[in-house]
Design a protein with these regions (language model features):
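Generic C-terminal helix-cap and adjacent flexible tail
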Residues: 1-3, 128-131
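Conserved N-terminal beta-strand and adjoining loop/helix that marks the start
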Residues: 1-19, 40
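NUDIX/MutT-family hydrolases
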Residues: 87, 96-127
Length: 131
């Protein structure tokens, strides 16, 4: 039986209506693919608590949870990932790539030019449809 993991991904939008995209490190599972930054929800955490904590840990900036955006489950070879993405905004600090290879800001209509991790694709498509 495959392990199930519940994770959060932050859809962080700036004042220019661009979305923060994170390139997974080659050392990570799904390396060299793009994702919305985030991570595992710890036991007892709400989605908003998890996303604020994960972004503080990964990008060293503070965000505000705005709203849940998409809930998607994707089955990989060894694990089932339930990814909940949420719209967020930065309240202090500047995101820096510590765990990722690179961070970029992209207009929503250009998101599909990147090669995304499979679990993130439904949220990317939903964002583009809403433009």
């Amino acid at each position: 039986m495959k392990k199930k993991v519940k994770v959060v991904g932050a859809i962080i939008e700036n004042d220019s209506y661009e979305i923060l995209c994170a390139l997974r490190s080659p050392k990570m599972v799904q390396g060299n693919l793009w994702e919305f930054p985030g991570g595992k929800i710890e036991e007892g955490e709400t989605i908003s608590e998890a996303i604020v904590r994960e972004i503080k840990e990964e990008l060293k900036c503070d965000i505000e949870f705005i709203e849940e955006f998409n809930d998607n489950t994707h089955e990989y070879e060894n694990v089932i990932v339930n990814l909940i993405t949420a719209r967020c905004k930065i309240v202090s600090g500047t995101p820096k790539a510590y765990e990722h290879s690179k961070l970029i800001w992209l207009p929503i209509e250009n998101l599909e030019t990147l090669k995304w991790a499979p679990a993130d694709i439904p949220a990317v498509k939903k964002l583009i449809e809403k433009v």
